Swiss-Prot record:
This is tRNA-specific 2-thiouridylase MnmA. Its main location: cytoplasm. The lineage of its organism: Bacteria, Bacillati, Actinomycetota, Actinomycetes, Streptosporangiales. Transmembrane segments: none annotated. Residues 145-147 are annotated as: Interaction with tRNA. Belongs to the MnmA/TRMU family.
Length: 363
């Protein structure tokens, strides 16, 4: 029986080529564009933003060229609740979220997938650069465009209904294929930054949502060294925007303490951590390891990969890095790999140095 596939079409080149490949693979494909804003822009500003009226038109034109039915689904309410409001709440709590990861988890592979299955579709197809082999996520052959990090939150059940046709090619090859197919989006710029912040001003967006809330900036000793307009404007590892005149050395954000509305700063070496605790674990590539098990871990999108040991303990994931990492932010994902295969993911809740933790325990 021919599988019915719903192709999520953003209006970009990747999703258009993915839909075309799904048709060539013999699936019965229908295209859908997700309207994620109740008040969309008419056009993009260069590579900033997405989900514009222009994007929906590009998606429809691509579907016409491919020769598949096309619909637009209004997901603005779900997107605002599960992605935008979550983004604001996480920053207000002193954490640094990844909205692309949350969108994949809550919108594309929860709300959209559930609706697709209810309508009789068998799978959802997207243009993500990732491979799916034997039910496991693998990094794309294009290391620069690899998106396994932001998809690692998907469960085995969700992956069983997912199709990713672009994991075996580079972005340049995707564009060349789009041109050969006569798709007008072949040269369309990739979208960057956060899609619902079209001007790229995250700090300004958060201030409009949360308001100005001045508070102290303190150093490692607790001495006040400056004032901020809102702790939500900062993330761990940040240096710019602190406006600390007369500092003897560069200072970086070490932590954000929302209860006291305090931003703590210090030297770069104080950013080092080698112990991470993650919450909300998802194990798509293996069973939860009860014993210490070697993995590779990635701690931010397109970030460095570290060797580590990890285990699940009392519903949380504990990770010990072989070498310290700098600027690890709470709220980001810690994605565990075996080589290039995703094993599991969790949301970073705690970070520390092992010797620091041992000293605190001894006290």
């Amino acid at each position: 029986m021919t599988l019915r596939v719903l192709a999520a079409m953003s209006g970009g080149v990747d999703s258009a080529v993915a839909a075309a490949r799904a048709v060539e693979a013999g699936y019965d494909v229908t295209g859908v564009h997700l309207a994620l804003s109740s008040n969309p822009q008419s056009y993009r500003t260069g590579a900033r933003g997405c989900c514009t009226i222009e994007d929906s038109r590009d998606a429809r034109r691509a579907a016409d060229v491919i020769g598949i039915p096309f619909y637009i689904w209004d997901m603005a309410e779900e997107f605002d609740r599960d992605v935008v409001q979550d983004f604001v709440a996480e920053y207000a709590a002193g954490r640094t979220p990844n909205p692309c990861l949350r969108c994949n988890e809550k919108i594309k592979f929860q709300a959209v997938l559930e609706r697709a299955l209810a309508l009789g579709f068998d799978a959802v197809c997207t243009g993500h650069h990732v491979r799916l082999e034997n039910g496991r996520l693998r990094r794309s052959v294009d290391a620069v465009k690899d998106q396994s990090y932001v998809l690692a939150v998907l469960t085995r059940e969700q992956l069983a209904h997912a199709i990713f046709p672009l994991g075996d090619c580079t972005k340049e090859e995707v564009r060349a294929e789009a041109a050969r197919r006569g798709l007008t989006v072949a040269d369309k710029p990739d979208s960057h930054d956060i899609c619902f912040i079209a001007d790229g001003d995250t700090s300004g967006f958060l201030e409009r949502r949360l308001g100005s809330n001045p508070g102290p900036i303190v150093d490692e000793t607790g001495q006040v060294v400056g004032e901020h307009r809102g702790a939500h404007a900062f993330t761990v590892g940040q240096r710019r925007g602190l406006n600390l005149s007369g500092a003897p050395h560069r200072r970086y954000v070490l932590s954000i303490e929302p209860v006291s509305n305090t931003v703590r700063v210090g030297p770069r070496e104080a950013l080092q951590v080698d112990r991470i605790v993650g919450e909300r674990p998802v194990w798509s590539g293996c069973e939860p390891p009860e014993e210490w098990t070697p993995f590779l871990v990635q701690l931010r999108a397109h970030g460095e990969v570290y060797s580590c040991r990890a285990r699940q303990y009392e519903g949380r994931v504990e990770i010990l890095l072989d070498e310290p990492a700098l600027g690890v932010a709470k709220g980001q994902a810690a994605v565990l790999y075996d080589g290039d295969v995703v094993m599991g993911s969790s949301t970073i809740a705690e970070t520390s140095r092992v010797e620091q933790a041992a000293a605190n325990h001894a006290e």
